[in-house]
């Protein structure tokens, strides 16, 4: 059963704030002024959206759609992390002015994990929350009932895991993935958080905060921390959140493996779509993202590290992520005539390289966007070459 309701909001007057995949590379972006201020710290609003409750094999999913699917183009489908919902995880990014040019070309589908949406009722006693694999198995029903043929996914943390699992199971439905703070491994993050933070209690809100933010952020960025602590504690049903966290804690390893030419490229379990991995350089997820990077095809994967940025780059640095996403989408052949972002126009770039014929082809579109930038030809076993971008 597919139920929908349409909610239309007035347009916001305030600003609410890359590239084709190539050889494995590590891009570092320096910090610009964070978006979050006292004026708009809780910029979680939806604008011009339709809400849908969609039946799937593992229960009902709450989905919010912005815009209408454009012909045969994919939709941008998002999936949030634990302790968040689509509003708190993605609306700062999608309400940012530089993203508006992108969303003119694509409909956006925000998926809330079961029971995590704003105002969600508690689950009945004895309810079994879907496993992470089952959460991925719910997504084909969303695409089918919204008459969507394919998607470009943006996932954060647990949501990045779900979208990766979905892409592994349904490669023809996924044209590209932006994976923020993705962890491909099976070990539980709760034990990790407890081991890293002495003196902290087992309070779920505290553990969620340790999952999202570095110790420096927890100390130094009080406005951001207070905003999200209140959100986790007050806006998300705590019983439902505990179930989602339990599902994420007991996830399976994704089982992905880097393909080796002439050995296993036809049989290895890995993503076949372009992937952009994103992590702040002080994020608790850095090691996990680097591990994921080491398992993916370097000719289709880019690792982007945001300098001086912590656990929520899409919230703290939406301008940087909007720019990166624009280049990513253009690299897949969409929006070829779109202009540079304001950030790109003010950028200076530097790097060094020797480029092979194959790697030239794989990154030619990217280099045309990052003017004056050349990238290194990297062996599968070599560490990533760093390309520093200042602005």
Q: Which residues make up each language-model segment?
A:
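Conserved acidic catalytic loop of the alpha/beta-hydrolase fold
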Residues: 132-152
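Conserved serine/cysteine hydrolase catalytic core
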Residues: 237-305, 349, 355, 363, ...
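Catalytic nucleophile loop
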Residues: 159-160, 322
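Alpha/beta-hydrolase fold catalytic core
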Residues: 1-76, 104-106, 330-391
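Post-His helix in hydrolase/transferase enzymes
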Residues: 314-330, 335-336
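Flexible "cap/lid" loop of the alpha/beta hydrolase fold
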Residues: 161-205
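Histidine-bearing beta->alpha loop at or near hydrolase active sites
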Residues: 306-313, 318-319, 343
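Conserved HGGG/HGGXW glycine-rich cap/lid loop of the alpha/beta-hydrolase fold
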Residues: 57-122
């Amino acid at each position: 059963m597919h139920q929908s309701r349409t909610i239309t909001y007035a347009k916001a007057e305030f600003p609410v704030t890359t590239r084709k995949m190539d050889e494995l590379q590590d891009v570092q972006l320096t910090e610009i002024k964070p978006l979050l201020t006292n004026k708009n710290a809780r910029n979680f609003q939806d604008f011009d959206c339709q809400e849908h409750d969609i039946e799937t094999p593992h229960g009902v999913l709450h989905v919010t759609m912005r815009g209408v699917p454009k012909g045969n183009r994919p939709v941008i489908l998002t999936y949030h992390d634990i302790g968040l919902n689509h509003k708190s995880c993605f609306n700062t990014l999608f309400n940012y002015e530089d993203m508006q040019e992108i969303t003119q070309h694509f409909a956006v589908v925000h998926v809330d994990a079961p029971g995590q949406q704003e105002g969600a009722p508690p689950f009945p006693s004895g309810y079994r929350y879907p496993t992470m694999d089952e959460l991925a198995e719910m997504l084909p029903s969303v695409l089918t009932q919204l008459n969507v043929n394919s998607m470009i996914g943006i996932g954060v943390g647990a949501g990045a895991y779900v979208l990766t699992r979905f892409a592994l199971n349904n490669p023809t439905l996924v044209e590209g993935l932006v994976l923020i703070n993705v962890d491909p491994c099976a070990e539980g993050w709760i034990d990790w958080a407890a081991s890293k933070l002495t003196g902290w209690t087992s309070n779920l809100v505290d553990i969620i905060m340790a999952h999202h933010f570095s110790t420096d952020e927890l100390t130094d960025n009080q406005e951001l921390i207070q905003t999200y602590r209140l959100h986790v504690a007050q806006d998300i049903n705590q019983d439902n959140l505990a179930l989602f966290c339990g599902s994420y804690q007991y996830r399976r390893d994704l089982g992905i493996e880097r393909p080796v030419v002439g050995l296993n490229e036809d049989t290895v379990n890995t993503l076949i779509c372009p992937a952009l991995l994103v992590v702040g350089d002080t994020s608790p997820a850095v090691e996990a993202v680097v591990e994921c990077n080491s398992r993916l095809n370097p000719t289709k994967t880019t690792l982007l590290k945001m300098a001086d940025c912590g656990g929520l780059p899409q919230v703290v640095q939406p301008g940087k992520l909007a720019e990166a996403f624009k280049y990513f989408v253009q690299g897949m052949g969409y929006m070829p005539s779109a202009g540079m972002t304001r950030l790109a126009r003010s950028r200076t770039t530097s790097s060094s390289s020797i480029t092979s014929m194959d790697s030239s082809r794989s990154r030619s579109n990217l280099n045309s966007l990052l003017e004056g930038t050349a990238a290194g030809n990297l062996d599968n076993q070599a560490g990533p070459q760093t390309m520093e971008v200042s602005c």
